[in-house]
Regions:
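Local sequence-structure signature of Cys/Sec-based thiol-disulfide redox active-site neighborhoods
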Residues: 1-25, 29-34
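Thiol/selenol-based redox catalytic cores and closely related redox-interacting motifs
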Residues: 36-120
């Protein structure tokens, strides 16, 4: 069985769509509220590795929490990014899905989910 950890925000319609898609494909997943329990440091590090060319993709740039900080992500170190993301789960792009503890998938795109999860 494929191990999926799914960090979600209950009020997020994109998260609900992604969860519905996973259920429709009969995937079991561990659901975690990203606001109450942000992703573990090792998962944030994994996301930083995967998105090293554009670290801004890890952030929920449309959210109020991000906009109020007025950040220049390119000027932040990886450690500063980690501390920021751990401090407020609403800063993190969601859903934040960890697949087999080796891959992070940010946001929801049905084609990307199928490509990354089903066809692996």
């Amino acid at each position: 069985m494929k191990k999926i950890i799914f960090y979600s925000y209950l009020k997020c319609s994109t998260c609900r769509k992604a969860a519905k898609w996973l259920k429709s494909k009969d995937f079991e997943f561990q659901l975690i509220d990203i606001v109450k329990e942000p992703p573990l440091v090792n998962y944030i590090n994994l996301a930083l590795e995967q998105y090293s060319d554009d670290k801004k993709k890890i952030f929920n740039t449309r959210g109020k929490a991000f906009k109020t900080l007025n950040l220049n992500i390119n000027c932040l170190s990886s450690e500063e990014i980690i501390q920021l993301l751990l401090s407020d789960g609403k800063l993190i792009k969601r859903p934040f899905l960890i697949y087999e503890r080796k891959k992070v998938i940010l946001g929801f795109n049905e084609i990307e989910y199928a490509k990354q999860i089903i066809q692996v």
